[in-house]
Amino acid sequence: MDDLLAQQIEALEVAVPYCERISNAIGNVMEELNGHRQEDTDEYITSIFNGINWIIEVYNGTRELINKDSVIIDKDSVNASIFKLNAAYNAKNDVMLSDAFGEVKDFVTKFMETARSITDNK
């Protein structure tokens, strides 16, 4: 196994449990944004944004491995979801933000499942 592949596999191994935590956090914040806002919801959103950014960095560094045989996660779709999330956040619209988080959660889940599959079959 060459160094780049080993680094990609290691990154994916770390990403799997992290994606699980971020996915759960997204689900929680979606509930808060749908009428159950808490005092710290905005701080929670910022923390989740940081986690999503890290996941995107790992995705960008492993995209060739993830999409080795076919396009499993489309970069343009991911970018569109992130753009929608940013627009909803800037609009300060909780309903739009919850919907946008739902799309990003789909990406996080797909990335986690793909990463798990790759690391299980290394």
Predicted regions and their residues:
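C-terminal-biased regions
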Residues: 1-122
